[in-house]
């Protein structure tokens, strides 16, 4: 422990170590000067550096004359307690930066100023500037595209040239007259026996237009029936023919007519009196019934007796 304390000696600040603010340059990251390992960071003034150089120099070397005017150059940091290799590396890095800044011409604009120290932008490499300037001045260096020759120029025999130099300019009225004359000639050339389709008549009156109507088959059938009946009536009146309803005569018709009470129709019949063919014609009753079909099992005569002699009944058990 004693050797370690002897190796790391802390020097008290003296008047020579106190420097004005314009000669001290610290970075933003070096806010605290105290290090955990006890290493002290000090900024050395030109006078201190000159004194140290005299102490380091031998007795044979001529003493360097101290300069009373302090230099404005910013001195690098000096870390005590570090190895010489690290110090040399740090000095070489800062020397390269300073030499690069000195090589830049003073005419370059300043980008920013921090702590009264100017930082200048490095000059662009000279190889890029001429290439850009040449490309801008000369523009596109590609060869110009040659347009092909049109076919009507290279082969005029394939084309026919039309010109309107001989045609005089006409007015609107002359154009209208020419159009009307052309239409009239076309209408005269059309055939007269032309029959248009239905609803295709070009005239406004619409003559010959086909009109579709709903077919009436039932009415035509009724008219035909009426016409046939009229012909039959006329022929009957001329020949004095009588209409006979003998097909409706019979016992069932008599029963139905007597039950319904409908009028009786007298029909002459020669078979009623066979003894006298030349005498008066006999009369026969005929009954009419409706179109509705009825079962005749439910009808019976009023005068008929179910237990009469005409009825047949089986033996009672």
Curated annotation (Swiss-Prot):
Region (Hom4): 198-238
Coiled coil, from the record: none
The keyword Nucleus belongs to this UniProt entry's keyword annotation: yes
Listed Acidic residues bias regions: 1-19
Free-text function comment from the UniProt entry: Protein associated with the U5 snRNP, during its maturation and its post-splicing recycling and which is required for spliceosomal tri-snRNP complex assembly in the nucleus. Has a molecular sequestering activity and transiently hinders SNRNP200 binding sites for constitutive splicing factors that intervene later during the assembly of the spliceosome and splicing. Together with its molecular sequestering activity, may also function as a molecular adapter and placeholder, coordinating the assembly of the U5 snRNP and its association with the U4/U6 di-snRNP.
PANTHER family membership: TUMOR SUPPRESSING SUBTRANSFERABLE CANDIDATE 4 TSSC4, U5 SMALL NUCLEAR RIBONUCLEOPROTEIN TSSC4
Name of the protein this chain belongs to: U5 small nuclear ribonucleoprotein TSSC4
Gene: Tssc4
């Amino acid at each position: 422990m004693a050797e370690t304390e002897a190796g790391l000696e802390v020097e008290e600040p003296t008047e020579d170590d106190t420097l004005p603010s314009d000669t001290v340059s610290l970075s933003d990251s070096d806010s605290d000067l105290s290090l955990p390992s006890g290493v002290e960071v000090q900024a050395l003034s030109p006078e201190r550096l000159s004194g140290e150089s005299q102490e380091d120099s031998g007795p044979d070397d001529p003493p360097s004359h101290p300069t009373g005017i302090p230099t404005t150059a910013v001195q690098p940091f000096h870390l005590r307690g570090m190895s010489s290799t690290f110090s040399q590396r740090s000095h070489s890095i800062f020397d390269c930066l300073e030499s690069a800044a000195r090589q830049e011409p003073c005419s370059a604009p300043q980008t920013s100023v921090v702590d009264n120290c100017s930082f200048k932008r490095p000059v662009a490499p000279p190889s890029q500037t001429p290439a850009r300037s040449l490309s801008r001045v000369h523009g596109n260096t590609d060869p110009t595209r040659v347009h092909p020759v049109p076919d009507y120029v290279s082969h005029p025999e394939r084309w026919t040239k039309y010109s309107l130099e001989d045609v005089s300019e006409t007015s609107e009225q002359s154009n209208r007259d020419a159009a009307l004359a052309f239409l009239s000639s076309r209408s005269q050339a059309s055939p007269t026996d032309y029959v248009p389709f239905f609803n295709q008549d070009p005239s406004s009156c619409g003559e010959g237009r086909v009109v579709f109507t709903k077919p009436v088959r039932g009415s035509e059938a009724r008219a035909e029936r009426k016409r046939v009946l009229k012909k039959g009536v006329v022929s009957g009146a001329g020949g004095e023919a009588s209409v006979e309803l003998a097909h409706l005569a019979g016992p069932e018709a008599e029963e139905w007519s007597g039950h319904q009470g409908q009028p009786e129709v007298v029909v002459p019949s020669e078979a009623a009196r066979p003894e006298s063919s030349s005498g008066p014609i006999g009369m026969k009753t005929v009954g009419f019934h409706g179109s509705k079909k009825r079962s005749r099992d439910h009808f019976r005569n009023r005068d008929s007796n179910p237990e009469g002699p005409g009825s047949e009944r089986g033996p009672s058990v």
